[in-house]
Regions:
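Nucleotide-state sensing region of NTPase/ATPase domains
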Residues: 47-131, 137-143, 147, 202-207, ...
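Structural recognition of the conserved hydrophobic beta-strand(s) that form the central parallel beta-sheet
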Residues: 72, 333-340
């Protein structure tokens, strides 16, 4: 899978950009605040239909302009495709796939598979459960597009139930029960997909981490669902029971306290919870193992390598971890941002396509 051409118009710091990346490593070099991350953000936008940095599409439009455009020509194992995203200030963005307007952003899922690794990805390990749920949701949406729609419907039903809980005077007979049944049916689909995902990921992560640490540490990744998937009543029955049991508490607090929106991933090193007790170095290594596992998982499920984005991340890793990362991306198209080529050359990345980013322009060397 690779992007053959990336076009930006009035997007962030770029009045116009027509980038023709190579199939291997594409190094985007420039000083801080020159727009390197803006270019890889556009790749992420084409994969997921949203930015990884902001939920406000208006921020993606170049300052002083009424609209913006992102277009990516790509090739995957189904053929050649064109993804276009048109932005207008004050309007919903429009997504086009092969020149046909998509009715929803979910139609993008799985068309352009992307794995992004940036310094903030340490939050997968060191922040709260919401970051780890986001990690699961992003990868499952790419490898199992039906999951994306189940999650969207679940979140919509959850929003409706929470709105009722905030205004108990509006609750009529059977109203909460209706939402409980919807949440339980959709929650069952989500929990089953997450179980399967973590089962596959944990095996890959264990082997990768063993390689990174020379066998000194064992990385254990476990799914920590809020609803027990092994309950004798099944996931659907267990969730109905949990929602009924927590109803008084939900009414008191004004939101739903049980369900997969409260799931987590357990991350342990040799039996020690790295989320709470790990050093910065251990958290960084665990995050790297998770990202490399994600890369391998998508490659296995989709039967082709995803596009890899490394946004100013090599400087965060020591030489050994850099080398492991380089080995893992041999068959990937990679967009790599950095302030200098020196570290890349030391890592043995002499054969790459280099683009210089400065003053709203990006030129090949």
């Amino acid at each position: 899978m690779e992007i053959n051409r990336l076009r930006l118009n009035q997007y962030r710091s770029y009045a116009a950009l027509d980038l023709r990346p190579g199939p291997g490593i594409n190094a985007i070099v420039g000083d801080n605040a020159e727009g390197k991350t803006n270019s890889v953000e556009a790749v992420f936008l084409c994969a997921f239909g949203r930015s990884h940095r902001t939920s406000r599409d208006a921020e993606l439009i170049m300052r002083g302009c009424a609209g913006g455009y992102v277009g990516a020509e790509l090739t995957n194992n189904t053929g050649s495709h064109l993804i276009e995203i048109k932005l207008r200030d004050g309007e919903r963005k429009k997504i086009f796939i092969d020149r046909q307007m998509a009715s929803r952003s979910g139609e993008l899922m799985g068309l352009l598979n992307v794995v992004m690794f940036a310094p903030e990805d340490l939050s997968i390990v060191k922040e709260g459960p919401a970051e780890r749920r986001r990690f699961m949701d992003m990868e499952l949406s790419q490898t199992h597009p039906a999951y994306y729609y189940s999650l969207q419907r679940y979140n919509s039903a959850l929003k409706q139930r929470n709105a009722l809980l905030k205004e108990p005077d509006r609750i009529g007979p059977g109203m909460l029960e209706t939402w409980d049944e919807q949440l339980s049916a959709l929650g069952e689909e989500i929990v089953m997909d997450r179980c399967e995902f973590i089962d596959g990921l944990s095996t890959i992560a264990y082997d990768l981490h063993k390689s990174i640490t020379g066998g000194r540490e064992r990385l254990e990744i476990v799914y920590e669902p809020d609803i027990d998937p092994e309950d004798p009543e099944g996931i659907y029955g267990a969730m109905l029971k949990a929602l009924d049991r927590s109803r008084a508490e939900d009414l008191r607090r004004g939101f739903t306290t049980a369900g997969p929106h409260r799931d987590d991933i357990g991350i342990a090193l040799s039996g020690i919870d790295v989320r709470t007790f790990g050093s910065q170095g251990q958290k960084r290594t665990a995050a790297l193992s998770l990202k490399l596992s994600e890369l391998a998982f998508i490659r296995e499920i989709k039967e082709e390598a995803p596009v890899l984005i490394l946004d100013d991340v090599l400087s965060e890793l020591d030489e050994g971890r850099q080398q492991l990362l380089m080995e893992s991306m041999k068959d990937c198209q990679c967009f790599l941002t950095c302030t200098s080529l020196e570290g890349l050359k030391r890592a043995g990345l002499g054969n790459m396509k280099v683009f210089r980013c400065k003053g709203g322009e990006m030129l090949p060397e």
